[in-house]
């Protein structure tokens, strides 16, 4: 008997072991991501031809202890390679694993290649050439636990490739994982539907199973084609047997398979795939969104003369691998999809079995179904759950509202604030700000977009519970506001005392224009933790605009310059905008251009504001400064703490503040205490105006900011 090894994705080992046993393999033994087995050559061939779960079938040539590269070379050199291939064949060596002597896989592969070539050369044979892309013979070696294992690949291209794909949608499901999903679902040939079928992999795989078609039947090339020990006669007999079984199976196959997808382009590829696989007549494809999902099986006709509906409606299996998103920002739309799928299942698929694969337990929870069984599978490196459900015959679409307390509060806020915002002619405002402690997030509306920013939860609350509450909030917010899930942006932030540092989330550019009391402003809802507009200072900016006519205006820690825009529109004679970030300074210039505020009278300075303040000597009639609570940026020479350093800040600002001028000072430190005595000592006076600058949508947060008007003492005398 020969010794073989079958590789597979993690989670498929048991399925593969049972499959190989049914094919006649002996001494079957599971290991991580693979199965050891023994048998005659025919068993190896059958595994290559019939395995629906394996990735590769390899013939074990040698296993030996290995401490260093010499052991590897000598172990490979002793294998009678000339019995497996000739010098005219091309070879490739794939190597995995490392140890202190073999520190990279390329070196390990090179040592084995050298051993092979040297053996051929020393015996007077032509030495084989290397072809890494498409070799006649592929040698595979693995180093682990002090042992080297050298094998000969019998598969050729990976066995999950069925050679019918004409094109795929994004992130296509591998065929052996699709086969595993079908096996674990318990499907027994009843009607099957995939409501998000993509390129049709699950449905084509189901058709192969129903028609008794060997998964490798369409393959033209195997790894053993140029192997010297290949038994062509034996292989042809096994191949003919599989062809006969497929022909007979296809003739008697009456399986009903249905596939839906919202993307018409992907459906075209799915149809092409089914046609290329020879199973197009078994699959009905339809363009449909999951929110409008309907049962594909007809209702039975009522029996004439009898009450009721006659015979029961046929039931089936719904199986799918819906998108599950790898980035948090993708979740809102996916929540909507999963919630819609769960509603559709309860509404129209009573009595059906359901099997869903996902890497996100939170998304699966949005189905609002109780799983009967659960399996752990891997989609590549991504750990997933396959959950099986049984839809009750009397099931109805759920009327229960998700996160009901939160939904009620949001509905109340929306009713009040929507009317106020329309009256004020505002298209961006805060809808919710952690009003309920257990739903710890801020929700801002920007026209027809929602930005949901989760505050970091206390460490004693389990992460899974926090995550589930966040997703419940998003679901409820979508339902209450009627927003499209695609237009809900989800972010996670620490609860900050102020604008510590502006954090970038991605390299993309998503800008949109909003309006605020006549000012046109660019915001970016996606790429940064903050959007470019601090909504809590809306009234402050309006006030600055009203105060600015004929004034020389200075904006420090200017961010995106929205306050400068208001001052410019209010008639400021000149403006100076200072910020350390070139990105935000460019953004400020774009905001000014958007409002036709261009010219030499509008200056933009990239500088450390504290350093710039200590050196500047111009005079300004109106100054706005909104510094961070704390900053220790690499580009700043020293750290800054607004409580500790605000008096020093005022000393510099006093020098720049013209006689009769006004300084508007704000910060976000909770419980900030102004040093009034210190101010008086340097000749300044302050008035707290926070009550006037906190807008209606922030009334619930008394500590969102504090704001002061500061003037020269003699001006208030």
Swiss-Prot record:
The keyword Repeat does not apply. Residues 43-154 form the THUMP domain. It catalyses: guanosine(2445) in 23S rRNA + S-adenosyl-L-methionine = N(2)-methylguanosine(2445) in 23S rRNA + S-adenosyl-L-homocysteine + H(+); guanosine(2069) in 23S rRNA + S-adenosyl-L-methionine = N(2)-methylguanosine(2069) in 23S rRNA + S-adenosyl-L-homocysteine + H(+). SUPFAM superfamilies: S-adenosyl-L-methionine-dependent methyltransferases (SSF53335). Its EC number is 2.1.1.173, 2.1.1.264. GO terms for cellular component: cytoplasm. Coiled coil: none annotated. It is found in: Cytoplasm. InterPro entries: 23SrRNA_methyltr_KL (IPR017244), DNA_methylase_N6_adenine_CS (IPR002052), RlmKL-like_Mtase (IPR000241), RlmL_1st (IPR054170), SAM-dep_methyl-trfase (IPR019614), SAM-dependent_MTases_sf (IPR029063), THUMP_dom (IPR004114). One of its GO terms (molecular function) is rRNA (guanine-N7-)-methyltransferase activity. Keywords: Cytoplasm, Methyltransferase, RNA-binding, rRNA processing, S-adenosyl-L-methionine, Transferase. It is an enzyme of class 2 (transferase). It holds the Pfam family RlmL_1st. Its main location: cytoplasm. PANTHER family: RIBOSOMAL RNA LARGE SUBUNIT METHYLTRANSFERASE K/L, RIBOSOMAL RNA LARGE SUBUNIT METHYLTRANSFERASE K_L. Belongs to the methyltransferase superfamily. RlmKL family. Specifically methylates the guanine in position 2445 (m2G2445) and the guanine in position 2069 (m7G2069) of 23S rRNA. This is Ribosomal RNA large subunit methyltransferase K/L. It comes from Aeromonas hydrophila subsp. hydrophila (strain ATCC 7966 / DSM 30187 / BCRC 13018 / CCUG 14551 / JCM 1027 / KCTC 2358 / NCIMB 9240 / NCTC 8049). The lineage of its organism: Bacteria, Pseudomonadati, Pseudomonadota, Gammaproteobacteria, Aeromonadales.
